[in-house]
Design a protein with these regions (language model features):
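The feature marks helicase ATPase cores and/or their adjacent C-terminal helical subdomains
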Residues: 1-336
Length: 338
């Protein structure tokens, strides 16, 4: 994999758009450019379109989930596992693992694939699934060979969001001959997957971009204290000089007046109030979601032909809420009046 590491404000999207446009795409092949959000994908499309008055047909730009589903699962999953998914589901899932698994199983029985399972299913297509038969492995080789025959390269934006399943997918495609080019910033791995950092450490083809077109150097001096040596950033000479100070609320009589008087260009205030939990889930929320799921299944079985799934979801939410309110007041979970 070719790895490009660039921090915030380094112009990653613009750089990637330039390199994509310069990519020598053979006749009959396409280049895929994938991002992790719709906004990021739209931004890349805009950058590419600006350079050539529209996105060429041999450059496919989409979100990662759209790519995995449309390019891997939809055309090939049936040939390996004899199952076709007719639609995608974005319905909420219960927090309880038991009920979550039940919900996912029910969706698949109905021919629906939940969006959270897309990376795993795509991994089964190109990488492996436990207990694969020889026949499945043989078909997978043909799938990879065919995909490589028309895919010239895959560019990945915001690569710090790569999860284990997506890493396995990209690794399998690379072994099949597809060129993989990553752009990202491990310092922005807010989801904590850690796979982009592992890729950087293992790769022999890593490029660092230190320029920052967004922040004053004085701000970067602070952030650089937390960055690895190769990932420290330098402000562009045209950036504003800027200033940096930290003010505690206890030292200020009137926060609103202080901010308005000082006339800051940007000001970020972090304020939270309430009860906070350090354990993984809140019992009340889990009870509600479990109850809502059961109510939804019962309603769906009765009214699936008469109304939409979203309307049933709304009704289940309302009924579950009323049932818990009734339980708090009477100790009885049954719903007497709505």
């Amino acid at each position: 994999m070719i790895v490009n590491v660039a921090g915030a404000g380094a112009g990653k999207t613009t750089k990637m758009a330039d390199i994509i446009m310069a990519h020598d795409i053979p006749d009959g092949k396409v280049v895929f450019c994938i991002a992790f959000t719709n906004a990021a994908a739209d931004n890349i499309k805009e950058k590419v379109a600006e350079k050539v008055n529209g996105v060429p047909d041999n450059i496919k730009i989409s979100t990662i989930h759209s790519f995995l589903y449309k390019e891997l699962i939809e055309p090939y999953y049936y040939f390996l596992y004899g199952k076709h998914f007719g639609q995608l589901s974005t319905s909420s899932l219960p927090p309880s693992n038991c009920y979550r698994s039940k919900k996912l199983f029910e969706l698949e029985q109905e021919g629906s694939l939940h969006i959270t399972k897309i990376p795993e299913k795509a991994k089964w297509v190109v990488y492996q699934k436990s207990k694969d038969t020889k026949e499945v492995k043989s078909v997978r080789k043909k799938v990879l060979s065919y995909f490589n025959s028309y895919c010239s390269a895959i560019y990945v934006d915001e690569a710090q969001d790569i999860s284990k399943d997506i890493y396995d997918v990209l690794s399998a495609l690379e072994r099949a001959g597809v060129e993989i080019i990553l752009y990202g910033d491990p310092k922005q791995d807010v989801k904590g997957f850690g796979y982009f950092r592992q890729i950087i450490d293992k790769s022999s083809d890593v490029h660092y971009f230190s320029d920052c077109y967004r922040c004053p150097q004085i701000h970067l001096n602070l952030s650089n204290t937390l960055a690895q040596k190769d990932e420290k950033q330098v402000a562009n000479c045209e950036n504003a000089v800027g200033s940096l100070e930290i003010v505690f609320e206890s030292d200020i009589d009137d926060v609103k007046e202080y901010i308005e008087t000082e006339n800051y260009g940007l000001c970020y205030i972090s304020q939270k109030r309430g009860e906070f939990y350090t354990h993984s889930s809140e019992t009340i929320d889990e009870c509600f979601e479990t109850l809502r799921h059961e109510v939804f299944r019962a309603m769906q079985e009765k009214w699936r032909e008469e109304t939409t799934e979203i309307e049933i979801e709304r009704a289940a939410y309302f009924v579950a809420e009323k049932m818990l309110e009734n339980y708090d007041q009477t100790g009885n979970l049954s719903l007497i009046h709505i």
